[in-house]
Design a protein with these regions (language model features):
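Gram-negative bacterial Sec-dependent N-terminal signal peptides
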Residues: 1-21
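N-terminal low-complexity or amphipathic/hydrophobic leaders
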Residues: 53, 62, 70-75
Length: 399
C-alpha cells in the first residue's frame, strides 16, 4: 500500500482513533506506573523505573536504585472500548474491538555518567470492526493497525543536575482494511526509522524538569489489494503502495516532591504537542483508478496532571491519581468511518508496591469521548459515541 507522506496513517488504517488512547491513532499506554496518573510524570520518570526508556531516556540518569545497576519493566494494558455510530435515522452500528497492548523497558547504568536503555512498545494502533452489512460498509468494515517500535538509547549525565540522551527507533507497521467495494481488502507492511532526543534537569533533590522529542517516522507501505470475484477478471489483485509519516511529538514535564507538611505528596504535569498537520491527504497508488482522500488534520495538545501519595504506614506503597485532556486532530468536515476521532478526557488511578527487588504496579483509566463527533460523509450521517476502560499491570525487577 502506498500513502503519500501528506497522509494520515490513520486514514489508511485505523482502528478508530476515537478509541486509541491518544490523539489520532496514538497509543498512550507506556507503563502501568504512568497509567495511574494519566501519563503525567512519564517524561520526568516520576516512578523511578525503566519506563522512561520510551518517554525520555535522559531521565534514567537520575535512577535511584542504590547499588543496583539494571532495571527491567514489563507491562501490559487491556483496552476495553465501547464505540458506536448512531445515524440521524436512529440506526446504530457498533465497531468496538477489545485489544491488548504489551510493552518492555530496560535500563543499565554503566557508571555514574552513562546509562543505556531499550524500549519495545506499540506507540500507534488499534482496531475497529463493523457488521459487514452496516450502512457505511462501502467506506469501511474492518480496520486494523499494528506497530512495534524498537528503541535503543543512551543517556549522558553531563553534570550532577543535567543529562541528555539520544536514540534510534526501528518501527514495524502492518495495516489491513476491508470494505464492501470492488477492492474488498487492502493490506501492507513497512519498516521505518526515527530518532529521539531527551533532556532532564534536576533542579532539586526531589524536583525535575524533562523534555523529549520523538521524530517523525517515514513508512513506505507495500502490499496488495484483493478484488471481489466478480471484478477479479477486470481489476485483478494488484500490488499497491503508500507513504506515511508518523508525526513529530514534543513533550515537556515537571515532577516535584512537596516539602514539609506535605512531604508525603508529589505533583507532576506533562504537556505534549503532536504535529498532525503534516497529514492533509491520503493517496494509494497501484489501483486501477487513482485514489485520494482529503484529511487536513491539525496539530494537537495533550496536558496531564498527576498526584502521588506515599503513605506513612507503608514506605513501600505508592498511590496515584491523575487526569488529562487530549485534543483530537480531526476536523468535523473530514471525519471518516475509519477514524471517528473526538477529544478525550482521562480520569486515572493506580498503585505501586515495592517488595524486595520487585515492584508491582497497576493502573486504571476511564476515558470519555467529548466534543463534536458528527459525521456526514457518503450517506453516513450521524455521530459517534463511546468511552474506554484501560486496565494495566506492570512488574519491575532491579539487579
Amino acid at each position: 500500500m502506498k500513502l503519500s507522506k501528506k497522509i494520515s496513517l490513520t486514514a489508511l488504517l485505523l482502528a478508530p482513533a476515537l478509541y486509541s488512547s491518544g490523539a489520532g491513532f496514538q497509543i498512550q499506554e507506556q507503563g502501568a506506573s504512568n497509567m495511574g496518573t494519566a501519563m503525567a510524570g512519564a517524561v520526568t520518570n516520576a516512578n523511578n523505573d525503566a519506563t522512561a526508556a520510551f518517554a525520555n531516556p535522559s531521565a534514567l540518569s537520575f535512577l535511584n536504585k542504590g547499588d543496583k545497576n539494571t532495571v527491567i519493566s514489563i507491562s501490559g494494558a487491556a483496552v476495553l472500548p465501547t464505540l458506536a455510530y448512531k445515524g440521524n435515522d436512529g440506526r446504530v452500528a457498533d465497531c468496538a474491538v477489545n485489544s491488548y497492548v504489551p510493552n518492555f523497558f530496560a535500563a543499565h547504568k554503566f557508571n555514574d555518567r552513562i546509562t543505556a536503555s531499550m524500549s519495545i512498545t506499540a506507540p500507534y494502533g488499534l482496531e475497529s470492526k463493523y457488521d459487514k452489512n452496516w450502512q457505511g460498509n462501502a467506506q469501511g468494515i474492518h480496520s486494523y493497525l499494528m506497530t512495534a517500535d524498537f528503541n535503543p538509547s543512551v543517556s549522558l549525565k553531563i553534570t550532577d543536575w543535567l543529562s541528555v540522551s539520544g536514540g534510534l527507533s526501528a518501527q514495524f507497521a502492518y495495516v489491513k482494511l476491508t470494505q464492501n467495494a470492488p477492492y474488498e481488502k487492502m493490506s501492507g507492511d513497512s519498516w521505518g526509522i526515527g530518532g529521539n532526543i531527551g533532556i532532564t534537569i534536576q533542579y532539586a533533590d526531589e524536583g525535575r524538569i524533562g523534555f523529549s522529542w520523538r521524530s517523525s517516522v517515514h513508512h513506505e507501505f507495500s502490499g496488495d489489494a484483493h478484488s471481489k470475484s466478480a471484478y477479479a477478471p477486470i481489476l485483478g489483485n494488484p500490488d499497491i503502495e503508500a507513504e506515511v509519516d508518523i508525526p513529530h511529538t514534543f513533550t515537556v514535564g515537571v515532577y516535584q516532591r512537596l516539602p514539609d507538611l506535605f512531604d508525603r505528596f508529589a505533583i507532576m504535569a506533562d504537556y505534549t504537542y503532536t504535529m498532525w498537520s503534516s497529514f492533509d491527504e491520503l493517496k494509494v497508488s497501484g489501483l486501477a483508478a487513482p485514489f485520494s482522500e482529503k484529511e487536513d488534520w491539525k496539530d494537537t495538545s495533550r496536558i496531564s496532571l498527576g498526584l502521588h501519595y506515599y503513605p506513612k504506614f507503608d514506605e513501600n506503597l505508592t498511590l496515584r491519581i491523575g487526569s488529562a485532556f487530549d485534543e483530537s486532530p480531526v476536523k468535523t468536515v473530514n471525519r471518516t468511518v475509519r477514524i471517528p476521532c473526538g477529544d478525550r478526557v482521562w480520569f486515572s488511578t493506580g498503585a505501586g508496591y515495592k517488595y524486595g527487588a520487585f515492584t508491582f504496579d497497576a493502573g486504571y483509566s476511564y476515558i470519555m469521548v467529548v466534543g463534536n463527533t458528527d459525521i456526514n460523509k457518503g450517506g453516513v450521517n450521524g455521530h459517534y459515541y463511546g468511552h474506554i476502560h484501560v486496565i494495566s499491570a506492570q512488574i519491575t525487577y532491579e539487579f
